[in-house]
UniProtKB/Swiss-Prot annotation:
Domain of life, per lineage: Eukaryota
Signal peptide positions on this chain: 1-28
Protein name: Limbic system-associated membrane protein
Cysteine pairs bridged by disulfides in the record: C53-C111, C153-C197, C239-C290
Function: Mediates selective neuronal growth and axon targeting. Contributes to the guidance of developing axons and remodeling of mature circuits in the limbic system. Essential for normal growth of the hippocampal mossy fiber projection.
Topology term for the membrane: Lipid-anchor; GPI-anchor
Primary location recorded for the protein, binned into one broad class: membrane
Entry keyword set: Cell adhesion, Cell membrane, Disulfide bond, Glycoprotein, GPI-anchor, Immunoglobulin domain, Lipoprotein, Membrane, Phosphoprotein, Repeat, Signal
Sites carrying sugar chains: N40, N66, N136, N148, N279, N287, N300
A Gene Ontology cellular-component term: side of membrane
Residue ranges occupied by any Ig-like domain in the UniProt entry: 29-122, 132-214, 219-304
UniProt modified residues of type Phosphotyrosine: Y94
């Protein structure tokens, strides 16, 4: 705040004398401002504010005051604040310059002028605007599906920032309002992802921060395909599941767990698993079970590896020859002599 400094005791009589000449008893600190009302000056935090005051003649005695006291009396600076100085572009100007304005500088400032005829005052109200700044936001959170979630986003600024929440999905659904809290009741897996908090006012660009919401849910088999195989060749069964955390996979046959050994190979990545038979034999045909599990649940799917029988070449030739003869007989019917009795 632009304040004042106590004068040296030795100089106190001289200072008091100056003030008595400059600020006569009963001087009103009100908005008569040379026939004008109070001026409002709006400045953004960190910028420089210039409070204008122009006198009628060089002999006028001038002072700047605010709610804290005297800032300048004539050319004598009473304020300790190094940001404050006089600005005189010409002989009749007695403006006040405040550098790096902050919120505590906001308020009423009075330019008091003592002329040869009567005292006058010019009052200026300094308004300090502050860009929006998010001061507190929820940390990333992990919850189970069906839980209630509350996200918090608090911001400072002048004017008061408007808070907007948005779920960062392809649809980009926004939750409009001046609410610092976003409540999600019975959250679903589709509502997981990043949530963006935006604090905005008219001073500058918005301040934006994000919160990541992870929703845990039990596994669900999304794809499982049976497969046909040929004896002596390689064949695979594949199983896919959706879950958070990512599921662990196991393979079974006839209630016996299968491991990667004896010509069988299991490969599992996040969300999918495969069982590969490197050299199919008759004993490999049959039913298999894919099991997907995480800390919230377990599910399974049944798959079948079945035989693919190839047709032999002679059989196909016989069919073709038969069809050829049959068609020929239709085109050229045989002539048969009647039986003699």
């Amino acid at each position: 705040m632009v304040g004042r400094v106590q004068p040296d005791r030795k100089q106190l009589p001289l200072v008091l004398l100056r003030l008595l000449c400059l600020l006569p008893t009963g001087l009103p600190v009100r908005s008569v401002d040379f026939n004008r009302g109070t001026d409002n000056i709006t400045v953004r935090q960190g910028d420089t504010a210039i409070l204008r005051c122009v006198v009628e003649d060089k002999n006028s005695k001038v002072a700047w005051l605010n709610r804290s006291g005297i800032i300048f009396a004539g050319h004598d600076k009473w304020s300790l604040d190094p940001r404050v100085e006089l600005e005189k572009r010409h002989a009749l100007e007695y403006s006040l310059r405040i550098q790096k304005v902050d919120v505590y500088d906001e308020g009423s400032y009075t330019c008091s002028v003592q002329t040869q005829h009567e005292p006058k005052t010019s009052q200026v109200y300094l308004i300090v605007q502050v860009p929006p700044k998010i001061s507190n936001i929820s940390s990333d959170v992990t919850v189970n599906e069906g839980s209630n979630v509350t996200l918090v986003c608090m911001a400072n600024g002048r004017p008061e920032p408007v808070i907007t929440w948005r779920h960062l999905t392809p649809l980009g659904r926004e939750f409009e309002g001046e609410e610092e809290y976003l409540e999600i009741l019975g959250i679903t897996r589709e509502q997981s992802g990043k949530y963006e908090c935006k604090a905005a006012n008219e001073v500058s660009s918005a301040d934006v921060k994000q919160v990541k919401v992870t929703v845990n849910y039990p596994p669900t088999i999304t794809e499982s395909k049976s497969n046909e195989a040929t004896t002596g060749r390689q064949a695979s069964l594949k199983c896919e599941a959706s879950a958070v955390p990512a599921p662990d996979f196991e393979w079974y046959r006839d209630d016996t767990r299968i491991n990667s050994a004896n010509g069988l190979e299991i490969k599992s990545t996040e969300g999918q698993s495969s069982l590969t038979v490197t050299n199919v034999t008759e004993e490999h045909y049959g039913n298999y079970t894919c099991v997907a599990a995480n800390k919230l649940g377990v599910t399974n799917a049944s798959l079948v590896l079945f035989s693919k029988y190839a047709k032999t070449e002679p059989d196909s030739m016989q069919v073709i020859e038969f069809l050829h003869i049959d068609l020929k007989s239709i085109r050229h019917p045989l002539k048969v002599n009647p039986i003699q009795k």
